[in-house]
Amino acid sequence: MLEAKHIALIEEAARLGHANIAQLRLCFQLLSVSAAIDRDCATRLAPHGLSEGRFIVLFLLHGAGGTLPPHELAERAGVSRATISGLLDGLQREGLLQRRSDAEDGRRLQIVLTARGKRLADDLFNQHTQWIGGLFDGLDGAEQVQLSRLLAKVWQHTDSGRSSQP
């Protein structure tokens, strides 16, 4: 499961006599699982001409009833306005969304899913959620709860986790 770079780092840490080899291995296992999920996700979305970012934009638009202003899409996706602009350009070229003037304020834009974009969002969201659910088929309910708790505990010791605590 470990990638070659992680094995090399563990071997070097062991050679240098570091005592936290087990923790390094756990971290690298977590990183390897995450990387595998990212690769699998990219492989599943690529035939549709989608990156994860584009998929998230489709999903957010679909969940909002098919229409949102670009700044709100950027905020919900957690990306900059420049990034959302690039994602929207690509999705528009593919015919999955359109930019339209706001009916109440013609200076503002609304991003609107096309019928093709809505169909793709419907299909992919169902496929994607089933695939993600299948990743945890080997864990019973109690194990899933335990894993969630353990991951939350690890997250609390990351810089992001510490900075989000009151």
Where are these regions (language model features)?
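N-terminal leader segment of winged-helix/HTH proteins
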Residues: 1-48
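A short acidic, leucine-rich amphipathic alpha-helix
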Residues: 72-74
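Short capping segments at the starts of secondary-structure elements
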Residues: 64-69
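Charged, amphipathic alpha-helical coiled-coil/dimerization segments
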Residues: 89-149
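Key DNA-contact positions within bacterial/archaeal DNA-binding proteins
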Residues: 82
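Short alpha-helical "packing" element that flanks the helix-turn-helix/winged-helix DNA-binding module
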Residues: 54-58
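C-terminal regulatory/oligomerization modules of transcriptional regulators
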Residues: 1-19, 142-166
